[in-house]
From Swiss-Prot:
Gene3D superfamilies: Ribosomal protein S11. One of its GO terms (biological process) is translation. The lineage of its organism: Archaea, Thermoproteota, Candidatus Korarchaeia, Candidatus Korarchaeales, Candidatus Korarchaeaceae. Keywords: Ribonucleoprotein, Ribosomal protein, RNA-binding, rRNA-binding. SUPFAM superfamilies: Translational machinery components (SSF53137). Located on the platform of the 30S subunit. This is Small ribosomal subunit protein uS11. It holds the Pfam family Ribosomal_S11. One of its GO terms (molecular function) is rRNA binding.
Amino acid sequence: MSTERKGKIGVAHIYSSFNDTIVHITDITGAETLARYSGGMFVDADRLEGSPYAALKAAMAAAKEAQRKGITHLIVKVRAPGGIKSRIPGPGATAAIRGLSRSQLTLIRVEDVTPIPHDGCRRPHGRRGRRV
């Protein structure tokens, strides 16, 4: 049984926060950008930029453009803000993955690449923390 795939492989970098979702498709090396869309390009109100609907539209537009450029398979890398910010991807992450899988592109693997600090930067709000 052969594991070789016919067609070109691309990498879909999905950055999803609670304010916006960015779908960026590159070649396998990451050097050449094939398509880049954000949720804010498809909705009018600023508060809707991070919504699942905007992420779905952005992912489908990026997938269509990548297909035009010859991509047939995708490796998906999902990223949340990370660091001292949220380690949970926003609501648009799953919708963006759904939008990519709805297109004719084959998803090879989905992985989480959120940056996790190993005792790097100190969190804000001082020694006693945030007093509410």
